[in-house]
Swiss-Prot record:
The keyword Ribonucleoprotein applies. InterPro entries: Ribosomal_uS10, Ribosomal_uS10_CS, Ribosomal_uS10_dom, Ribosomal_uS10_dom_sf. One of its GO terms (biological process) is translation. Involved in the binding of tRNA to the ribosomes. Gene3D superfamilies: Ribosomal protein S10 domain (3.30.70.600). PANTHER family: 30S RIBOSOMAL PROTEIN S10 FAMILY MEMBER. Part of the 30S ribosomal subunit. This is Small ribosomal subunit protein uS10. It holds the Pfam family Ribosomal_S10. GO terms for cellular component: ribonucleoprotein complex; ribosome. Belongs to the universal ribosomal protein uS10 family. It comes from Novosphingobium aromaticivorans (strain ATCC 700278 / DSM 12444 / CCUG 56034 / CIP 105152 / NBRC 16084 / F199).
Length: 103
């Protein structure tokens, strides 16, 4: 396992929860002796929706909504068996999407 890297990509709608989850992962990996690169903030995806306010007329009267998706990237450079075991047992907050890849 020493030759491989672990790339963790986190997504969430709330940046405070995302930063907290990123910190928990980083602390867990550091405690097991692994090296960490990051957290690297990736570009925020902003989806905008425009809807009519009224049900019938008034096309000029509209309301705009947006959903922001925040993303972070963590690289664990020298993982060992204890690092992988600790990451599997880690319980993160709800609302954080985690993608793990071996690179």
């Amino acid at each position: 396992m020493e030759a491989q890297n672990i790339r963790i990509r986190l997504k969430a709608f709330d940046h405070r929860v995302l930063d907290q989850a990123t910190g928990e992962i980083a602390d867990t990996a550091r405690r097991t002796g692994a090296l960490i690169r990051g957290p690297i903030p990736l570009p925020t995806r902003i989806e905008k929706f425009c809807v009519n306010r009224g049900p019938h007329i008034d096309k000029k009267s509209r309301e705009q909504f947006e959903v922001r998706t925040y993303k972070r990237l963590l690289d664990i450079v020298q993982p060992n068996a204890a690092t992988v075991d600790a990451l599997m047992k880690l319980d993160l907050a709800a609302g954080v999407n985690v993608e793990i890849k071996l690179a």
